Amino acid sequence: MKKIFFLSLFLMASLAVMHSKAIDPVEVQTSTAVTEVTFYSPEIVRVVKTPLGKKGNTRKSLVVTLEPQDVKVQKSENASAITIKSTVLTVKIDKKTGLVQFLSKGKNLLKEKSYGFEERTSGPDAGSFRTTIVYQLDKDEPIY
């Protein structure tokens, strides 16, 4: 009987891990776009930007391949920004512009300077968008 109990407990724990999910995405709508932020783990976050009035991306990310976890976050809001914090990473979204900033322990990791969308009108990608994001970098800081 003990073996059946422990086997059942193990199976339930396994199922709970398989079905864990991230918190609901945080969305900020500006005059030109919708910015959606989803934490997949305390140190991994997925950001999706969609032109305002267009259908959002429903495809699975090719970059963030981790299955979403149940991440404990703190959300706060003031007049200019929404802030979402995990135990490792802080994400700030400017409510007016939709620009995103990533911080760790209060120090800037990466900050968007601007973004834009170019609609694809022909070929297999017709109807999708090419997104351009410009980041604020230090003078000698490269991105790989």
Outline where the language-model segments fall.
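N-terminal accessory segment at the very beginning of proteins
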Residues: 5, 18-144
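Sec-dependent N-terminal signal peptides
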Residues: 4-13
